[in-house]
């Protein structure tokens, strides 16, 4: 298994980008979320994302999904749930350009698992990003905050 991407909107513009965590940041974090019945979007995060989108930022989700590597849910189940998240955000006025996710278990030592920068490197290969004007948003300083520090980017923590 390798880093996987789902690109929803491709563009050729160089844009500042919000790299945002999914579980616990955009939606309620349930153990190995993959059922649409469990999907609960946080309104405050939607407001934050709409703020940045209104200032011209691109929105990209970056998320660790070890439930795939552990066999708790399939790649298809992940995609269905993630599409549900992205579609709900779109209904609420937030356009997500892509999702980059690490399907590996933490003990596999991959280069894509946050707080490593592999997911961001993949995004940089697919999109033209004004990295100096970009930021990371997440709910965990030890993962999302460390990702931001590894990239030299600002970090905005959310808590619910």
UniProtKB/Swiss-Prot annotation:
Principal localisation: cytoplasm
Any one biological process term the GO annotation gives: carbohydrate metabolic process
Residues annotated as site: Contributes to substrate recognition: 113
InterPro entries tied to this protein: HAD-like_sf (IPR036412), HAD-SF_hydro_IIIA (IPR006549), HAD_sf (IPR023214), Heptose_bisP_phosphatase (IPR004446), Histidinol-phos (IPR006543), PNK3P (IPR013954)
Catalysed reaction, written as an equation: D-glycero-D-manno-heptose 1,7-bisphosphate + H2O = D-glycero-D-manno-heptose 1-phosphate + phosphate
Pfam family, one: PNK3P
Enzyme Commission number, as recorded: 3.1.3.-
Source taxon at top rank: Archaea
One GO cellular component term: cytoplasm
Family: Belongs to the GmhB family.
Protein name as catalogued: Probable D-glycero-D-manno-heptose-1,7-bisphosphate 7-phosphatase
Species, as recorded: Thermoplasma acidophilum (strain ATCC 25905 / DSM 1728 / JCM 9062 / NBRC 15155 / AMRC-C165)
